[in-house]
């Protein structure tokens, strides 16, 4: 059960990072931390109950890798356009 406790702690750290950080890259890293906490939870439940949670965790990792590529591409494009990755600057809708 220490897997689930560690997973909950990592998820709480990720939520804290999303709520308190102001740069888009750190918010993005916090979201990735939350996804990894969910993966750890899947594997922890699989180990405790003899299920195949590893397969689901591998699928989540594959989707997260694609998300990282798209997300970092968007952050780089925003930085080139606005010269900043501050989340507060991104809330303004301009043409």
UniProtKB/Swiss-Prot annotation:
Entries under InterPro entries matching the protein: NADH_UbQ_OxRdtase_chain4L/K, NUOK/Mnh_C1-like
Record keywords: Cell inner membrane, Cell membrane, Membrane, NAD, Quinone, Translocase, Transmembrane, Transmembrane helix, Transport
GO CC terms of this entry: NADH dehydrogenase complex; plasma membrane
One GO-annotated biological process of the protein: ATP synthesis coupled electron transport
Domain of life: Bacteria
Compartments, record wording: Cell inner membrane
Role according to the record: NDH-1 shuttles electrons from NADH, via FMN and iron-sulfur (Fe-S) centers, to quinones in the respiratory chain. The immediate electron acceptor for the enzyme in this species is menaquinone. Couples the redox reaction to proton translocation (for every two electrons transferred, four hydrogen ions are translocated across the cytoplasmic membrane), and thus conserves the redox energy in a proton gradient required for the synthesis of ATP.
Entry-linked HAMAP family: NDH1_NuoK
Name under which the protein is recorded: NADH-quinone oxidoreductase subunit 11
Gene name tied to this protein: nqo11
């Amino acid at each position: 059960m220490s897997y689930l406790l560690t997973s909950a702690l990592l998820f709480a750290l990720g939520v804290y990072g999303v709520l308190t950080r102001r740069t888009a890259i750190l918010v993005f890293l916090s979201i990735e931390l939350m996804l990894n906490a969910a993966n750890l939870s899947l594997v922890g439940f699989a180990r405790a109950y003899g299920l195949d949670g590893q397969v689901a965790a591998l699928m989540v990792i594959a989707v997260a890798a694609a998300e990282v590529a798209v997300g970092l591409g968007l952050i780089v494009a925003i930085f080139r356009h606005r010269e900043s990755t501050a989340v507060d600057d991104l809330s303004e809708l301009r043409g």
